[in-house]
């Protein structure tokens, strides 16, 4: 499924400094400037998966404006406009964790397990906010893993391959998407596990009618 990024795979923006991407939405207007990350439900899960939550890693946040995560289908290679049922979570700033080394996750938990069919279907994680102050950690090919940026040069880890099947997308209006093939959002997907070794019991009764 390609569900998670490698730990600390945040790119470096300039002169060995952390690289971050902004998830934003224009205040008071319909146009949105989100970012999105595609992922694939591989043939390892032919019957699909039930997502329970997603961890995203933020470098900064707003003091009063929330941030929204959505799950959308990928259509013709780009994030679609529809939201998977129950696939939207809104977090207030006090629910968002930030870190300067991409080490502390922020968990977006769905109200109900979110079913995504298998057969190599692709979906997108979309981050939107009315604030310009949200910055999410990403990786960039050829740059240094932020978790090793403070180590001597010979101990630093270079990002030499993408950690999963997918691509980062950027948008100026929420409708037109531009892929960034060498960048990826840092995230972790959690799925439900069901115990099929036990039998369920359902009890029905009919009330006595007068």
Residue ranges of predicted features:
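A short beta-strand element within beta-rich, extracytoplasmic domains
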Residues: 1, 47-61, 123-127, 183, ...
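Short, surface-exposed beta-strand/loop patches at domain edges
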Residues: 1, 117-119, 127-209
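Short beta-strands within extracellular/lumenal beta-sheet-rich domains
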Residues: 28-45, 104-110, 185-188
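Solvent-exposed residues in well-ordered beta-strands and their adjoining turns
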Residues: 42, 57-59, 111, 128-130, ...
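Aromatic- and Gly/Pro-enriched, solvent-exposed loop/edge beta-strand patches characteristic
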Residues: 1, 62-159
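Threonine/glycine-rich low-complexity segments that form extended coil/beta-edge repetitive scaffolds
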Residues: 23, 27, 31, 35, ...
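N-terminal leader/pro-regions and domain N-caps
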Residues: 2-29
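Extended extracellular/luminal ectodomain segments enriched in beta-structured repeat modules
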Residues: 32, 44-53, 62-64, 118-122, ...
């Amino acid at each position: 499924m390609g569900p998670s990024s490698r730990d600390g795979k945040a790119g470096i923006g300039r002169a060995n400094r952390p690289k971050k991407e902004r998830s934003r939405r224009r205040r008071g207007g319909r146009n949105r400037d989100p970012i999105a990350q595609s992922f694939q439900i591989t043939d390892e899960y032919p019957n699909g998966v039930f997502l329970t939550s997603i961890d995203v890693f933020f470098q900064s946040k707003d003091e009063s404006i929330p941030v929204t995560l959505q799950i959308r289908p990928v259509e013709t290679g780009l994030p679609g406009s529809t939201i998977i049922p129950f696939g939207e979570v809104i977090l207030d700033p006090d629910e968002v964790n930030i870190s300067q080394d991409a080490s502390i996750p922020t968990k977006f938990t769905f109200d109900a397990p979110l079913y995504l069919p298998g057969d190599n279907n692709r979906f997108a994680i979309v981050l939107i906010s009315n604030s310009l102050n949200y910055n999410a950690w990403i990786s960039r090919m050829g740059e240094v893993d932020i978790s090793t940026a403070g180590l001597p040069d010979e101990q630093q880890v270079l990002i030499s391959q993408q950690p999963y099947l997918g691509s980062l997308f950027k948008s100026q209006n929420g409708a037109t998407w531009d892929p960034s093939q060498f960048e990826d959002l840092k995230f972790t997907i959690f799925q439900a596990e069901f115990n099929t070794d036990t039998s369920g019991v359902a009890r029905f009764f009919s009330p006595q009618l007068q």
